[in-house]
Amino acid sequence: MQKKLQKLLEQAYELCEDGNYVRALEYYDMALDIEPDNLNAMVDNGVTLQNLGRFNEALQMYEKALSIEAENLDVLINKGSVLHILKKYSEAIFCYDAVLDHDKRNAMALAYKGLSIGEMGNMPSAIKYFKKALRMDQDYDLAQISLLTAKNILKNVS
């Protein structure tokens, strides 16, 4: 049974790598039929749904994963990113803060929090979070690009 599950997850991963997300979902569903509480399958299923623009379904999958492991940092970041896309910035920040409570040096959570804060109109605070993210990982592209964008927005407003 475990071998079959692993094979399904590998096939789903390969399909995602090829951009065949719809077919990958079928494999994740089969994997979850075998092991309904498989956290990896839930997370990857959620990411795949997100890639397809099925954000509410992705959110449900992340919430299901969090019901199994409430403090899973990857799931919290993924849930936050979906909430951000859905323009639920305060809820997204809540997810990123939960990650930062466990790992204050998490560059992704810092940068994503900066993005949500920026969307809420607080560019100086957003810049602060992008800079913190870059202190944790100086090569983090998202933080670098977001920092430059936020600075340009501030400059154009002045």
Q: What residue ranges belong to the model's regions?
A:
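Register position in tetratricopeptide repeats
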Residues: 17-18, 51-52, 85-86, 119, ...
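Helix-start (N-cap) detector for alpha-helical repeat units in TPR-like alpha-solenoids
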Residues: 5-6, 39-40, 73-74, 107-108, ...
